[in-house]
Amino acid sequence: MLDIRVIRENVQWAKDKLATRGIDAAEIDEVVALDEKRRALIVRTEELKKNRNAASEAIAVAKRNKEDATEQIAAMKNVGAEIKELDAQLAEVKEKVDYILVRLPNFPDDSAPVGLDESFSREERKWSTPREFDFEPLAHWDIGEKLGILDFERAAKVSGSRFVYYKGAGARLERAVYNFMLDQHAKEGYEEMITPYLVNGESMFGTGQFPKFTEDVYTMTNEGEPMTLIPTAEVPLTNFYRDEILDGAQLPIYFTALSPAFRSEAGSAGRDTRGLIRMHQFNKVEMVKFTKPEESFNELEKMTADAENILKALNLPYHVITLATGDASFTSAKTYDIEVWLPAQNTYREISSCSDCTDFQARRAQIRYRDEDGHVNLVHTLNGSGLAVGRTVAAILENYQNEDGTVTIPEPLVPYMGGMTKIG
């Protein structure tokens, strides 16, 4: 959530920044006007409460002196009624301010390319050259079905579209991939976590999914309480410190976790209908950081490098792009997308998204730290995929396929596969 004081003191700047994210200037004008009304109501209410307290003292003095206090008592009742009315107005105006504020996205960082869609995103670097095949490479879903390690048809029978069964060596490959990722991140200083997969509404609000993106998730009720299946481990990892004040000496804090991610994929009809790219349920290894404000953008570079190192170790070609202001996620000030090469599609596809959310999530979730001078400040939060496991499996199947239909296991995964060097 944005700081209303920043908007109030930098109205035109806020309009210009949020215009690059598709926000109409009228929304900023409205929230500024409501904020001005809110502050005026607060001033008037405080004045009346001060007058009421003075009147109360005058009544007490009059009673001690056995004087008539009828007028003061009547005046105090009138003041009390006015305060009650102003409090109701204040609550209504505050609700309107909050309604707008919680739906405004984060301010983009100056280093992000300006533009409303992905066509304005900027490629930063490429790593490795895509393999040249002397045969027509198959798509990963065809490879998986031919090898009997992926079964989309039976998953559709059981659950519907965008689900899969991993079988045999396929299941083992998935497990090898995420165990390798977790081990790598542990070496980089991340503390491994196993999180809840169901979270409450406060948690979804804290990381910015609610109230704007309720249609993108699956919800249920637990003992009368609405709960959400997590769309990413970012939600439980970030909310671990919700409503807490951390010791600044502990920062930065790194967490990593494997979890299933559940997504309704609302609005994705007709896109990536085959394969492992766009699923309703998939495994993902997540990275989350809590940092001091002055360290967060440097920590974003390090987090992105941590995700890249997985692909380098697996020798999977990729490139890194900085998302345009209008293409970044709701909570992000700056996002790097890492896209891996898929030969059958002859293109790069997203496999990781690493974002610096600055103090946007921390303000919503009230995650703070106490600095060495005793001052309490909001932390900065970062999150990134390290990596999406199913998409990594897809990239391995396509990039390591052989003409005879087998798939070579990337060398770092061989120990995790019990010494197996090929599937098929």
Swiss-Prot record:
SUPFAM superfamilies from the entry? Class II aaRS and biotin synthetases, tRNA-binding arm
**Which pathway does it take part in?**
Aminoacyl-tRNA biosynthesis; selenocysteinyl-tRNA(Sec) biosynthesis; L-seryl-tRNA(Sec) from L-serine and tRNA(Sec): step 1/1
What EC number(s) would the UniProt record show?
A: 6.1.1.11
Q: Check the record and name the Pfam families matching this protein.
A: Seryl_tRNA_N (PF02403), tRNA-synt_2b (PF00587)
Q: Give me the reactions it catalyses.
A: tRNA(Ser) + L-serine + ATP = L-seryl-tRNA(Ser) + AMP + diphosphate + H(+); tRNA(Sec) + L-serine + ATP = L-seryl-tRNA(Sec) + AMP + diphosphate + H(+)
Q: What class of enzyme is it?
A: ligase
Reply yes or no: does the keyword Transmembrane helix apply.
no
Give binding positions for ATP: 263-265, 350-353
Can you supply one Gene Ontology CC term for this chain's record?
A: cytoplasm
**What's a single GO BP term from this record?**
selenocysteine biosynthetic process
Q: Which residues bind L-serine?
A: 232-234, 286, 385
Task: Tell me which UniProt keywords the record has, alphabetically.
Answer: Aminoacyl-tRNA synthetase, ATP-binding, Cytoplasm, Ligase, Nucleotide-binding, Protein biosynthesis
Annotated GO molecular function terms are: ATP binding; catalytic activity, acting on a protein; serine-tRNA ligase activity; transferase activity
Name its cellular compartments.
Cytoplasm
Primary localization class, coarse: cytoplasm
* Family classification: Belongs to the class-II aminoacyl-tRNA synthetase family. Type-1 seryl-tRNA synthetase subfamily.
The domain section of the record reads: Consists of two distinct domains, a catalytic core and a N-terminal extension that is involved in tRNA binding.
Q: What does this protein do?
A: Catalyzes the attachment of serine to tRNA(Ser). Is also able to aminoacylate tRNA(Sec) with serine, to form the misacylated tRNA L-seryl-tRNA(Sec), which will be further converted into selenocysteinyl-tRNA(Sec).
NCBIfam families hit by this protein: serS
What is said about its interaction partners and assembly?
Answer: Homodimer. The tRNA molecule binds across the dimer.
- Entry protein name: Serine--tRNA ligase
